[in-house]
């Protein structure tokens, strides 16, 4: 798989761009702040419908514009597929697949399968559980695009149940049985959709675990062994290492946990149980990586998580595109060499770098120099001619 064409309209610092790409390695070179990362961000958005830098779409639209457009042509096994995404301010986003409108933007997920390495990856180890949940959910969705619908259904139920919790927090004292019966209905829906999302995550962690261990050993052979595990918000939940998750058991466990925590939830007006409270536990030896790993070990773990994702996507039978956003500058020589070795085997690698010296020596790569220019639209990014 590779991206043959990337078009941008009013995306971040790019008023207009049409980039012809191909298999092999392409390096986007330019000073920081000139718009290199925006290219990688656009490709990642096309793959996942989300940015790796911000949680909302508004910052993606260039100042003064009312929408941004990302257009890609992806080649997979000789077949071309065109995806156009319109990111709108204050209204629903739109998508077209092979120039035909689709009902939901989620229908384009899976056309471009990519793995992103970025400086923000350190948050996978040192950041909040939300960063690790997003890593799992993005990868699960790339492997099985229907997971996007599962995530959307769960998020919708979670919002509605949380709103109900806030509105009925005093119902048990007023004896309002009707309000509590309504909460029972939302408990059932949350457990149903939550169990489906948890099952997808747990199965993914089961497949990722040996790949993470192997990748970490490659990156840091002198360090402690690495391990990952799924940690649920349900008390006493332990995911089996070698068995597919039981969705029925997960649903029953969620219902029991919701019943046990209801008083606390009514007191606080928040949902305390469910996959939105779960975490991916990262361990080095017998210690958690967060808080105990050195800076180098943290980077090795973060890169190992991305390498494991690359291995899984490749094993699924479709070569993912590698997106490397200024990551070589963050790594020492050994980790840089290990990552470069993996990148050499990929069908397409798209890299950003502030200076060419950040790129591994001996790399045969096309160089695209990025500039920042004054125009009628203000200062905009441009490709040097």
Swiss-Prot record:
Name of the gene this protein is made from: recF
Highest taxon listed in the record's lineage: Bacteria
Single GO term (MF): ATP binding
Record-linked SUPFAM superfamilies: P-loop containing nucleoside triphosphate hydrolases
Name of the protein described by the UniProt record: DNA replication and repair protein RecF
Any one GO biological process: double-strand break repair
Predominant location category: cytoplasm
InterPro entries per UniProt: DNA-binding_RecF, DNA-binding_RecF_CS, P-loop_NTPase, RecF/RecN/SMC_N, RecF_2
DNA-binding among keywords: yes
A GO CC term attached to the entry: cytoplasm
NCBIfam families: recf (TIGR00611)
Record function comment: The RecF protein is involved in DNA metabolism; it is required for DNA replication and normal SOS inducibility. RecF binds preferentially to single-stranded, linear DNA. It also seems to bind ATP.
Binding locations of ATP: 30-37
Entry keywords, A to Z: ATP-binding, Cytoplasm, DNA damage, DNA repair, DNA replication, DNA-binding, Nucleotide-binding, SOS response
Location within or outside the cell: Cytoplasm
Family the UniProt entry places it in: Belongs to the RecF family.
């Amino acid at each position: 798989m590779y991206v043959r064409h990337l078009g941008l309209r009013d995306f971040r610092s790019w008023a207009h761009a049409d980039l012809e790409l191909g298999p092999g390695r392409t390096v986007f070179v330019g000073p920081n702040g000139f718009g290199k990362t925006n290219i990688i961000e656009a490709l990642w958005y096309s793959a996942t419908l989300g940015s790796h830098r911000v949680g909302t779409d508004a910052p993606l639209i260039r100042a003064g514009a009312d929408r941004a457009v990302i257009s890609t042509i992806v080649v997979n096994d000789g077949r071309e597929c065109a995806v156009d995404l319109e990111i709108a301010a204050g209204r629903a986003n739109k998508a077209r697949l092979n120039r035909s409108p689709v009902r939901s933007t989620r229908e384009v997920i899976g056309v471009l399968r990519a793995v992103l390495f970025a400086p923000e990856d350190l948050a996978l180890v040192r950041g909040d559980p939300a960063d690790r949940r997003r890593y799992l959910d993005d990868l699960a969705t790339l492997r099985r695009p229907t997971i996007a619908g599962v995530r959307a259904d769960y998020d919708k139920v979670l919002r509605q149940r949380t709103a109900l919790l806030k509105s009925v927090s005093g119902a048990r004292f007023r004896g309002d049985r009707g309000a509590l019966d309504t909460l029972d209905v939302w408990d059932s829906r949350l457990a149903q959709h939550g169990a489906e999302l948890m099952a997808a995550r747990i199965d993914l962690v089961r497949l990722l675990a040996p790949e993470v261990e192997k990748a970490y050993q490659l990156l840091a052979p002198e360090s402690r062994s690495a391990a990952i595990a799924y940690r649920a918000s349900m008390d006493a939940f332990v995911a089996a290492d070698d068995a597919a998750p039981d969705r029925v058991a997960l649903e029953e466990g969620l219902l029991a946990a919701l019943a046990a925590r209801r008083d606390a939830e009514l007191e606080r007006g928040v949902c305390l149980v469910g996959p939105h409270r779960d975490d991916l536990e990262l361990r080095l030896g017998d210690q958690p990586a967060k808080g105990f790993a050195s800076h180098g070990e943290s980077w090795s773990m973060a890169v190992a998580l991305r390498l494991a994702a690359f291995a899984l996507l490749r094993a699924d039978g479709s070569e993912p595109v590698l997106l490397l956003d200024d990551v070589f500058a963050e790594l020492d020589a050994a980790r840089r060499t290990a990552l470069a070795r993996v990148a050499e085997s990929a069908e397409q690698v798209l890299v950003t770098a502030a200076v060419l010296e950040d790129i591994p020596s001996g790399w045969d790569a096309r160089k695209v120099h990025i500039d920042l220019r004054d125009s009628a639209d203000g200062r905009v990014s441009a490709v040097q001619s």
